[in-house]
A protein has these predicted regions:
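Nucleotide/phosphate-binding loop and acidic/charged catalytic motifs
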Residues: 188-194
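N-terminal glycine/serine-rich phosphate-binding loop of ATP-dependent small-molecule kinases
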Residues: 1-100, 167, 223-224, 240-241, ...
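Active-site phosphate-binding/coordination module
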Residues: 54, 66-153
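Short, glycine/acidic-enriched loop or turn micro-motifs at the edges of active sites
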Residues: 12, 24, 109, 256, ...
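Short acidic-aromatic active-site loops that bind/stabilize oxyanions
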Residues: 47-58, 145-149, 225-229, 253, ...
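Short, acidic/turn-prone active-site loops that include or flank metal/cofactor-
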Residues: 32-33, 38, 102-109, 279-281, ...
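Active-site core segments that coordinate phosphate-bearing ligands/cofactors
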Residues: 6-7, 118-143, 150-187, 198-209, ...
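Short beta-strand to alpha-helix junction loop
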Residues: 203, 228-232
Length: 496
């Protein structure tokens, strides 16, 4: 029997395919393609819309996976899927798409109600009996996360309030939709992805039925809940032909990209804090039983347990904001359009020439606020004539990001999680940035080990497929066997 497993990661920027080999604990091959399926008009982008063609996105993911399988000659035993955990796609009874896919970036629930000062999200929060400490985002009891516009339930609430919710439809998210197309069955959802709907009862691991009713939403809009690491069904003949693999290949239920990234990165759940910096950023640790979450999120983990995670305050987009400022300034002042990707490398190099501590410059990096402080603003402080430089601003920002991520870990300890002895990093925001790596080591006060496998979320999804296929008894066992130990090239922490 083949020890290869294929996984698809349906991201908003790229779609990724990966094949792993359990015999060698290696990635056989990976392929990515830009996600070109967005259909949002320029006008709608200006008002916070984010609409996509999910059928086109699925075709793109299948084509990308087929090219990888052809190039590697891999013959997978099963297929796993992961991807963005929020958003909404409506389906009719025949499983055809109805309207566009609203991504997690779509902010229509933040629109003000006609003739009123408060938003649809405010109305939803009030109707569902949410609670919020002054200055914090509202949250429904036991849902593990604050109420945010990109979740599926707020999209449904907005559609219903505007009489745009057709009868006899149901909802799904992108990863579940892809699985549905692969197996030709109605979408189902596991607990890790159900959290992204915003109305999932985390301690009970069930839909919050009373809350859903209070919001005036019909239960039929929500997919059936199933366990992680189980099979959604066999691959259809049509999809098998597109992929170039045998029909009937087992396809696993999709799981959330954050949880899959943890599974693909962390070998020792009990003793590790995992930091991921991609477009967003998270610091997370595994716990067996629910704890009060404070300002963090309590996310169901794959099969059992939970991740206590600091989510969304800082990430790759934080550094991108500073990069874009310099790029726009260069263009405005010199009438030159700089290479924005090369500008990242140059800013990191300049930051590396600045002493640790940025000679007193401090940055509050919350350009978009945070879950606990949604109205917070970014700031640079303690600047002098000598330190108002690109290098000082960059180092201060990266060190400020490390503080925010480490504060999540310190909050988890305060809530009762216990300390961890290992720090593992994932995501290109960490792998390509030695200044940030060193800042994280300093803030967490432990060495940072960078995962040896790229595309960690896809690796985790492949491991989910392997568990569903019987290659491992649990996802924890799969992670312990496959996920990164000490990297082949250790993270350098000798930045000046």
């Amino acid at each position: 029997m083949s020890t290869h497993y294929l996984a698809l990661d349906i991201g908003s920027t790229t779609v990724v395919s990966i094949v792993i080999d359990l015999d060698t604990n290696a990635v056989v091959g990976a392929a990515s393609a830009a996600n070109s399926s967005e259909t949002t008009s320029a006008t709608d982008k200006l008002i916070g819309r984010s609409e996509w063609d999910l059928d086109a996105m699925t075709e793109l993911a299948i084509e990308n996976a087929a090219a990888l399988l052809s190039r590697t000659n891999a013959r997978p035993s099963a297929i796993g899927v992961t991807g963005q955990q929020q958003g909404l796609q409506l389906l009719d009874a025949a499983l055809n798409t109805v309207g566009p896919y609203f991504s997690w970036q779509d902010q229509r629930a933040q629109d003000p109600l006609p003739g009123q000062q408060h938003t649809y999200l405010d109305a939803m929060a009030q109707r569902g009996g949410s609670t919020a400490t002054e200055g914090e985002m509202p949250a429904f009891a036991n849902t593990g996360c604050p109420l945010v516009a990109g979740h599926a339930a707020p999209h449904l609430f907005w559609l219903q309030a505007n009489n745009q919710l057709p009868s006899a439809v149901s909802g799904t998210t992108a990863p579940e939709f892809v699985v549905s197309r692969l197996v030709g069955k109605r979408p189902v959802v596991d607990p890790t992805d159900a959290l992204g709907w915003g109305v999932y009862d985390v301690p009970k691991r069930a839909w919050a039925d009373e809350l859903i009713a209070d919001l005036g939403l019909d239960q039929s809009l929500f997919p059936e809940l199933v366990e992680s690491c189980t099979m959604a069904g066999p691959l259809t003949a049509a999809m098998a032909q597109k992929l170039g693999v045998p029909a009937g290949l087992p396809v696993a239920v999709a799981s959330g990209d954050h949880q899959c990234s943890f599974a693909g990165t962390v070998a020792d759940y009990a003793n590790t804090v995992a930091v991921n910096v991609g477009t967003g950023g998270q610091a997370a640790l595994y716990i067996e039983a629910p704890l009060p979450r404070g300002s963090l999120e309590l996310r169901p983990y794959i099969q059992r347990g939970y991740l206590l995670a600091g989510v969304g305050a800082v990430g790759g987009r934080t550094f991108r904001t500073l990069r874009d400022f310099f790029a726009d300034a260069i263009h405005a002042l010199a009438d030159v359009q700089p290479d924005r990707e090369a500008l990242y490398e140059r800013l990191v190099a300049l930051a590396a020439d600045v002493p640790v501590g940025a000679e007193g410059v401090r940055a509050d990096p919350l350009f978009s606020g945070s879950r606990s402080r949604p109205r917070a603003k970014a700031a640079f402080r303690e600047l002098t004539a000598a330190t108002l430089t690109a290098g000082h601003l960059t180092r201060a920002l990266l060190e400020g990001m490390a503080v925010e991520l480490a504060d999540s870990y310190r909050e988890a300890i305060r809530l009762g999680s216990g300390a961890r002895s290992k720090l593992v990093g994932a995501g290109n925001g960490i792998k390509l940035n030695p200044v940030l790596r060193a800042a994280l080591e300093a803030e967490f006060a432990m060495p940072l080990h960078v995962g040896s496998h790229g595309e960690e979320a896809a690796v985790g999804a492949a491991l989910c497929a392997a568990v569903a296929d019987g290659a491992f008894g649990s996802i924890a066992e799969a992670s312990a066997a496959f996920a990164s130990g000490p990297p082949s090239t250790s993270a350098v922490s000798s930045v000046k």
